[in-house]
């Protein structure tokens, strides 16, 4: 049985997903703002976030909210971390790969997570200590023992483009062992796919915390491991934590092997969490 908070999160995520689907054939009418290079927001992002916030605030008025569009509001100790549309660039181009991501964070750690893909009607949920689920089916990370034959997911953060040479060096080294490396444009779905075994691992520097808060818990509850590029614990999700981070996620053996290649390539060495 799901926790009451997760039920509310699911309701909010499905409502936001409906907003995304209602506007998918009206993309040319949307007002789009370019916040920075390769970082966009649209009317749909704002509408979806408002739907989520309304639903969550109705049930839990005292919890804080950290949203991609609205920033940090209220209580830092217990808060919702929201990305109403992870994969905005995909959505705006009609590329069918994006999702809604919601996490409940207590004292800097995600305790509950929901990622909803409205196009495929795939609902990923997790609660700390209770495992991870895709559409009512328990999921687990893949059980590979090393990088050989792995399918890896990554992203190219617009905040790290000046150091792209290091990431490309890392990709070059990984392709000597991995089967393939994918760049889908939705970090939350990348992590959800790691959690259910569709991908073996995910790595990226410069990713925003609201993109990965829910996905981190999904991977952990699916038996996986999450760390930064130095092998340390993933960042706290509160007012003391960074806005962006480095992240590796997968089963523990693949994550450790991936981390060694990342370190040797120099990728992320000059990463600034304030960027």
Swiss-Prot record:
What GO molecular function annotation could you give as one example from this UniProt entry? Answer: RNA binding
Question: What InterPro entries does the database record attribute to this sequence?
Answer: IMPase, Inositol_monoP_metal-BS, Inositol_monophosphatase-like, Inositol_monophosphatase_CS, Inositol_monophosphatase_SuhB
What this protein catalyses is: a myo-inositol phosphate + H2O = myo-inositol + phosphate
What top-level class of enzyme does the UniProt entry assign? hydrolase
Q: Which Pfam families match?
A: Inositol_P (PF00459)
Q: Does the keyword Transcription regulation apply?
A: yes
Q: What name does UniProt use for this protein?
A: Nus factor SuhB
What GO CC terms are in its UniProt record?
cytoplasm
